[in-house]
Amino acid sequence: KKLVSKYLKEDKSEKKKFKPRIKARIRKNKQILTKNLDNFFDWIKGAELVELKECNTDEDPVRPELDNNFRRSYGRKIYGVKFKNEIHAVMCFAYTNEIPKSVDELDMLSQDAYLQSTLRGQIVGKIAIAYTVWSKKKGGGKLIVKEVFKKIKKSNHLNRLVTLSPLTDMAYKFHSKNGAKLIQVNETTQNFEYKVPK
């Protein structure tokens, strides 16, 4: 009995010592988590969508072969999410009147829409085609989609936001998670559409 009671006493004292350690660790983890969440929301709230003259094409995981000249000619645009003078996410667009199934088609259709725009007072295409997007900071991809979506809703001539995405699970998950619907699967690409309510 004495031996049992001795071990029970030791066990209780160990539990008492152990509990404050757990509480301290939980408290510290909560502080770290709160700080990380605050930092995350600070950057999300303070970020802005800007038009870029160029981007680092080596950072583009989707279409690094397309140079800045391609990305800026025939009315094509490069947008970035800027926070504290740093670009954290990039999305490249072309404007067309039809949905392309490949980069070559995108090039041809955006040139055609651009040439037609000279007759229409510089209104280039009715469909915004997002052909590449990448992020250097967590939440950047989702944020740039949201900001571009707002910009398209405000525009007078754009009525659709469609992607020209690679045939990867990552692209499927990203666009599906952000509210886009898969509209067609092509030989080397897939197109998703974000509904633009007018």
Give each language-model segment a name.
Residues 2-52:
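Conserved N-terminal entry element of GNAT/NAT acetyltransferase domains
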Residues 68-84, 89, 94-103:
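A short helix-loop-beta-strand connector motif used in the catalytic cores of GNAT acetyltransferases and
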Residues 92-128:
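Conserved acyl-donor/pantetheine-binding loop and adjacent beta-alpha core of acyl/acetyltransferases
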Residues 128-140:
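A short, internal acetyl-CoA/4′-phosphopantetheine-binding micro-motif in the GNAT/acyltransferase core
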Residues 135, 162-173:
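Conserved beta-strand-loop-alpha-helix junction that forms the acyl-donor binding cleft
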Residues 137-153:
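Conserved acetyl-CoA-binding loop-helix of GNAT-fold acetyltransferases
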Residues 176-186:
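Conserved acetyl-CoA-binding loop of GNAT-fold acetyltransferases
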Residues 188-198:
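C-terminal "cap" of GNAT-fold acetyltransferases
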